[in-house]
Amino acid sequence: MRFNMTTTLFSPAEFEQALRDKGRYYHIHHPYHIMMNDGHATKQQIQGWVANRFYYQVNIPLKDAAIMANCPDPATRRKWVQRILDHDGQHDDHGGIEAWLRLGEAVGLDRETILSQKMVLPSVRFAVDAYVNFARRACWQEAACSSLTELFAPAIHQSRLDTWPTHYPWIDAEGYAYFRGRLSQANRDVEHGLELALEYCNTVDRQQRMLNILQFKLDILWTILDGMSMAYVLERAPYHTVTQEAVWHQKGLLG
């Protein structure tokens, strides 16, 4: 195992490339995603992914609100608030959370089941909660730049649009609206996120820390799929050696 560190200050172009190079660790390369995009996933595996990723979706606005709460710059907040509106919706746009619920219905899940979060695995909950808590506790620039996995997001959304309709004809096509919407939104968000990162990371320490923060976010996305792989591929859900029931803790412990 090697840990690559440098004592050299990157130019803005070099630093941007270093950030983009992290794409080799994006969860599009996880075996679970490869399985889904290659058409080898079962209905249960698709449903499990949608139900668990819903927990990620509903927490993104909380993450973004935490960033805004720590940010003293009005101009940045005016731009950043659009991310919350993208997910929560406004006026005639129902938002990404509603679009994800419709994806859930398109793959055969009951809306109430998704909203109950009873299918959310502990490992997924822990990973997502770690991300939100980081956004609450880190300085706003670092928390904002943890979102730079959006650099790689358009490719993963496009891959689903390109492959899923063929591989999974049983999925209602209306469910793909979320992926189509995120294609343009992610590109817009990347421009702002990169601008912040290149402005803030003007020392070796800041650049290296930001690369580590981006890796932290990549670790979260990968870990989410590791948990799903245990439950839905290896059929080793939590406590599988003693029960087939979903006995793990549910939402609302602190609410």
Swiss-Prot record:
The lineage of its organism: Bacteria, Pseudomonadati, Pseudomonadota, Gammaproteobacteria, Moraxellales. Pathway: Cofactor biosynthesis; pyrroloquinoline quinone biosynthesis. Ring cyclization and eight-electron oxidation of 3a-(2-amino-2-carboxyethyl)-4,5-dioxo-4,5,6,7,8,9-hexahydroquinoline-7,9-dicarboxylic-acid to PQQ. Belongs to the PqqC family. One of its GO terms (molecular function) is pyrroloquinoline-quinone synthase activity. This is Pyrroloquinoline-quinone synthase. It comes from Acinetobacter baylyi (strain ATCC 33305 / BD413 / ADP1). One of its GO terms (biological process) is pyrroloquinoline quinone biosynthetic process. It catalyses: 6-(2-amino-2-carboxyethyl)-7,8-dioxo-1,2,3,4,7,8-hexahydroquinoline-2,4-dicarboxylate + 3 O2 = pyrroloquinoline quinone + 2 H2O2 + 2 H2O + H(+). Signal peptide: none annotated.
